[in-house]
A protein has these predicted regions:
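Noncatalytic, solvent-exposed loop/strand surfaces
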Residues: 17-409
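Bacterial N-terminal signal peptides
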Residues: 4-15
Length: 409
């Protein structure tokens, strides 16, 4: 079975999203999987483009799809260097812009990494609410028609701009706040009011990280997997109380979202010496010496998240080397250079895995222990955001446009 128990946590606790929706970063399960069929294999600027529309401003938040709308965030420059941080939505069938509303504002934006910016976190849709997040610049809840319900802001020194995306768990909106100079914590807000329900400080030392949490089910208990600098944590998602933690010495500025399957949490340790570690999720306290099942250093990613399909884990690193390993043992099946540079996380749909480079090129492969290339598809512009899949269509955000890609009928 492709989708592991992590799928049930989101589907039961977060929203009533149907199979056509892609309501959060990395889809319904948060693992990059789609149940759609008829998803296009081939496309180009001249082929299988249902529509292509310009996107105002700048941002690398990935598209999410629910209720017939495609949502993203963007940062629009204004006078004297200010930025209007906006939520935008397009009609999924026509590409017509239907919402464009200011959710937050920055009068004096500081430095942001060229691969990041002020509109990198992906929206999350749950029920009749859309939650948009801009890191230390603020968080907001909107109605699906674009009315702002509440705003909140947690200040911390996010050196390279915004990054990690929130998640919805029941009536909680949870996100990481990992900044420089030991400012690092995780916070849960009431989805209805924006009021704080819990806040948990990271252990020291701490540093910057830009990750998205994941809720998994282990035995009879849910765990909030939250990746920070130097350590990854499992918390009780209702209270923020720590369940277990694992340490890694040289890891910070983490980006990939964790992946879960076969009882293992797959964690990318971040900058300096990128390493992928597989941690058994049934521990208590400090599990560094007891629960690491295997590690991978050759080909480990710094930015793209891994994807688990069956018994194989697929990781593409930032320089385009694809590594496929046995998920249980870490044994490498093959390594293959795809070409290009990578920030977007891969997706699995219709029996195929899609890897999208920063240069607008998507390589499509079959799952398995041997490499095969099914298609190579090219679009104009840069593509650092991850694709979304809904309604048998692929939605791709470039640095200037949003595409709906669909096989001709």
């Amino acid at each position: 079975m492709w989708v592991h128990r992590v799928a049930l946590v989101f589907l039961l606790c977060a929203s009533s999203a149907d199979a056509q929706d892609w309501p959060q970063f990395r889809g319904p399960t948060g693992q990059g999987h789609s149940d759609e069929r008829g998803v296009p294999l081939n496309w180009s600027e001249q082929n299988n483009i249902a529509w292509k529309v310009p996107v105002p401003g700048a941002g690398w938040s990935s598209p999410v799809v629910a209720g017939g709308r495609v949502w993203m965030t963007t940062a629009v420059p204004e006078a004297r260097g200010a930025l209007s941080l906006r939520a935008i939505a397009f009609d999924a069938q026509t590409g017509r812009e239907v919402v464009n509303v200011e959710a937050a504002r920055v009068d004096r934006p500081g430095y942001a990494h060229f691969k990041n910016g002020r509109a990198s976190p992906t929206p999350v849709i749950a029920g009749d609410r859309v939650y948009v997040h801009f890191g230390a610049d603020g968080t907001a809840a909107l109605t699906t028609s674009g009315e702002v319900v509440w705003r909140a802001r947690y200040r911390y020194d996010s050196q390279h701009g915004s990054g990690g995306t929130p998640i919805v768990y029941g009536d909680l909106l949870i996100f990481n706040c990992d900044g420089n100079y030991q400012e690092a914590f995780v916070v849960a807000l009431d989805t209805r009011t924006g009021k704080q329900r819990w806040k948990t400080q990271r252990r020291q030392p701490a540093d910057q990280a830009y990750t998205t949490p994941l809720v998994i089910r282990v035995g009879e208990r849910d765990q909030l997997i939250s990746i920070g600098a130097y350590r990854a944590y499992a918390y009780d998602p209702m209270t923020g109380k720590e369940i277990w933690r694992v340490s890694y010495d040289d890891g910070f500025s983490n980006v990939p979202r964790p992946v879960y399957g076969h009882g293992l949490v797959f964690i990318a340790t971040g900058f300096q010496q990128p390493t992928l570690i597989a941690v058994r999720a049934d521990g208590q306290g400090d599990v560094t010496r007891t629960h690491i099942a295997w590690t991978l250093t050759r080909g480990a990613p710094f930015t793209p998240s891994p994807i688990l399909v069956g018994d194989e884990l697929y990781v593409v690193n930032d320089t385009g080397i694809l590594t496929t390993v046995d998920a249980r043992t870490g044994t490498i099946h093959y390594q293959q250079r795809l070409g290009g540079n990578y920030s977007a996380s891969p997706v699995f749909a219709d029996g195929r895995i899609y890897f999208q480079s920063e240069e607008g090129v998507t390589t499509v492969i079959p799952p398995g222990r041997q490499f095969g290339r099914l298609a190579t598809n090219r679009l104009d512009g840069a593509t650092l955001a991850s694709m979304a899949i809904a309604g048998a269509a692929i939605f791709i955000r470039s640095d200037s446009h949003l595409y709906r890609i669909q096989a001709a009928r």
